[in-house]
Curated annotation (Swiss-Prot):
It comes from Shewanella halifaxensis (strain HAW-EB4). InterPro entries: MeTrfase_TrmA_AS, MeTrfase_TrmA_CS, SAM-dependent_MTases_sf, TrmA_MeTrfase, U5_MeTrfase_fam. PROSITE patterns: SAM_MT_RNA_M5U, TRMA_1, TRMA_2. It catalyses: uridine(54) in tRNA + S-adenosyl-L-methionine = 5-methyluridine(54) in tRNA + S-adenosyl-L-homocysteine + H(+); uridine(341) in tmRNA + S-adenosyl-L-methionine = 5-methyluridine(341) in tmRNA + S-adenosyl-L-homocysteine + H(+). Its EC number is 2.1.1.-, 2.1.1.35. Belongs to the class I-like SAM-binding methyltransferase superfamily. RNA M5U methyltransferase family. TrmA subfamily. The gene is trmA. This is tRNA/tmRNA (uracil-C(5))-methyltransferase. The active site is at C323 (nucleophile), E357 (proton acceptor). GO terms for biological process: tRNA methylation. HAMAP family: RNA_methyltr_TrmA (MF_01011). Pfam families: tRNA_U5-meth_tr.
């Protein structure tokens, strides 16, 4: 991470640089004007991870700066939420004099929400015993006088929870309050306010939809739940078990009755749809009964594999959220043969980095 680049006074310039770069990158495609969704210039990250440095009686957070090729002390961290920045000094001052809690502590992770919850994970190079548990309970009680906080201790093959290993985010999305169960150590969108803009964009591009929606790589149901209002039914796939469990929680708490989650990979689902293989996980689910005119994909950095690209081309409308514009380019080389890009967006999830989150909406030619 290049900590020196994180200067809010340069935010607009760096965003414009990304806008120009993304526009030029896709110049060979007939794209509409790029819609650009900005981030807050500071305090935008809902999660942060720090290594812990021990120096005599002192103890502090640090990160590794790749530009300086050295560790940098982080008493505060500008990109992290205000809640994380408030927690950082409060926590470290309680850890410093506590020989049990600080011993062999090597990392601290924070997961916060816009709605005011924070989860703190303490990671150790030692086994956690009853004495540690007693001190951790006291730490949690002390922090709870100032914060809506939960605490986790982690060591090799150990995970001790006080009292929850998740937070519940509450987001106002297009005038509707949505709640999202976000579990520790699993993927969630890091930039809460930009995540809302992404959800609202996806709702807008699919607002006149008919039939059903298929989503691949649905995670904790982030998009599926927001988009369910635009479709008769939603069928979504996700492989990671913790994410599927979070998605089921989110379906229930948001009272979404037209969304079905299947725990399987996009590649396996592609084979099932092509009737190349049958899967026990699909027993009782009649895939042929779904009338999916729209498909939503938010793949990992590697993008869509060739078979999934072929599957996606079979749908009238495609919503593609990409965390890697280069693999999106590769996929669009095929998708553009059958579909036309009618919406194109840049979401600045990660200010002051080269990372560009983008969205395209394609309709069959």
């Amino acid at each position: 991470m290049n900590l020196a680049a994180m200067d809010p006074t340069t935010y607009d310039v760096q965003l414009e640089t990304k806008r120009v770069k993304l526009t030029q990158l896709f110049a060979d495609f007939d794209t509409p004007e790029l819609e650009t969704f900005s981030s807050e210039p500071a305090h935008y990250r809902m999660r942060a991870e720090f290594r812990v440095w021990h120096e005599g009686e002192d103890l502090y957070y640090y990160m590794f700066d790749k530009e300086l090729n050295s560790k940098v002390r982080c008493d505060q961290f500008l990109p992290a939420s205000e809640l994380i920045n408030k927690m950082m000094p409060a926590l470290v001052e309680l850890l410093k004099p506590n020989t049990i809690l600080r011993h062999r502590l090597f990392q601290i992770d924070f997961l916060s929400t816009l709605s005011g919850e924070i989860l703190v994970s303490l990671l150790y190079h030692k086994q956690l015993d009853s004495e540690w548990e007693q001190q951790a309970k006291i730490l949690k009680q002390t922090l709870s006088t100032q914060f809506n906080v939960n605490l986790i201790g982690r060591a090799r093959k150990q995970k001790i929870i006080f009292d929850k290993d998740f937070v519940v985010e509450s987001l106002n999305v297009a005038g509707k309050q949505l709640q999202y169960h976000q579990i520790e150590n699993s993927f969630t969108q890091p930039n809460g306010k930009v995540s809302v803009k992404m959800l609202e964009w996806a709702i807008d591009v699919t607002k006149n939809s008919t039939g059903d929606l298929l989503e691949l790589y649905c995670g904790n149901g982030n998009f599926s739940i927001a988009l369910a209002q635009n479709f008769d039914r939603v069928l979504a796939t996700e492989l990671a078990k913790p994410s599927v469990e979070s998605a089921q929680y989110n379906i229930k708490v948001n009272q979404v009755e037209n969304l079905q989650i299947i725990r399987m990979s996009a590649e396996d689902f592609t084979e099932a749809m092509a009737k190349k293989r049958s899967f026990r996980r699909l027993e009782g689910i009649d895939l042929d009964s779904y009338n999916c005119n729209t498909i939503f994909v938010d793949p990992p950095r590697a993008g869509l594999d060739a078979d999934t690209v072929k599957l996606v081309q079979g749908y009238e409308r495609i919503v593609y959220i990409s965390c890697n514009p280069h693999t999106l380019l590769d996929n669009l080389a095929e998708l553009s043969k059958t579909h036309k890009i009618t919406r194109f967006a840049l979401f600045d999830q990660f200010p002051y980095t080269d990372h560009m989150e983008s969205g395209v909406f394609l309709e069959k030619r």
